[in-house]
Amino acid sequence: MARTDAEKAQDYTAMGHSVELINAVIAGSQMADQDATERQACVDRNVEHLELMKAKTDWGSEDMTATTNAIAAGKGYTAS
């Protein structure tokens, strides 16, 4: 079933939240009080979410640059 424009907009917003969280965890401004395992799991979950959403074929003109960059950063991240 095809997503509506409203659903796509909601999904795109959620992707932005994942991008922000990945970047913040990597920068140390989010989840700094959590252990490395929890930070890694958070980044991994959000990368997986972004990969699944980005792979959808019904996107229009949405800019996926931040998503692509967050996926790459998240895949390169190793919590310590």
Positions of PLM-derived features:
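Beta-rich interaction/scaffold domains
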Residues: 2-80
